[in-house]
Amino acid sequence: MNLITRSDFDGLACAVLLEEAGIIDSYKFVHPKDVQDGLVEVTPNDVLANVPYVPGCGLWFDHHSSEQERLKLLSEVKYEGMSRPSRSCARVIYDYYGGAKRFQKFEDNGMMWAVDKSDSGDLTSEEILFPTGWILLSFIMDARTGLGRYRDYRISNIQLMTDMIKYCRTMTMEEILEVPDVKERVQRYFSQELKYEAMIKAHTTVHDNVMVIDLRDVEEILSGNRFIEYVLYPEQNVSIRVIWGKMKQNVVFTVGYSITNRTCTADIGSLMLRYGGGGHKMVGTCQVPAEKAEESLQAILAVLKAGG
């Protein structure tokens, strides 16, 4: 079967487990919004993982609370697979196909520990500021880090994602970090670290408990850790990151609880669902038409301030 998943560490771990279980033999990495909007062809030969449900798929695995709200899963949708709230979609697949009996080596090597921590944002300030091992790999392989915006690598990020499926099944974490295609991305990540922090500070405004990071006027959005703002702004408990979408036709809002100040109570996934997006209680994203961006931003900001 063919896997359709997103290009992040959780998507990678899903691919590793599904290939280990003999379920898939090909892959397609996509943006979840494209799946939700019907822009990705889906057939009964496809396994959807960590992306919105599409009728007619062969298998579906997910862990986003907004999908259960969107589809009212218990009564209205029939599918093969599993969808339930979880720290990662990989953990849903892990449990579905036998847990430790089948996948013990991925507990032993630390991959499952890392994907649960990174995808749920269960990270310490030290892990954000000084990432090592699997946690570092989780940042390097996440499209939101921004390393894929550069085109001067030996191979593309999509090719590296494909190669990493084999690496994670056959190599130790230390060996993976020594792969030249991984090393050059690690080097870029650390070389831009201080400039990335400066960029975040220069484009952040604080509104009570909410930080708004508006990067629409930034010519080159540097690569960096998407959690760093929570270390830089410990008094705020939720962030809204604002960037241009494709061809500046829409604006993307990425909203998330602070992982260092865990006092926000708003349901982010449900809020994003109102704007055609989705997510979990603590994190989510949506895209809105450019002409409605300011109106939408103010409405989202009002909800987050009220739920702070």
Roles of regions detected by a PLM:
Residues 118-209:
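Hydrophobic, aromatic-enriched interface-forming segments
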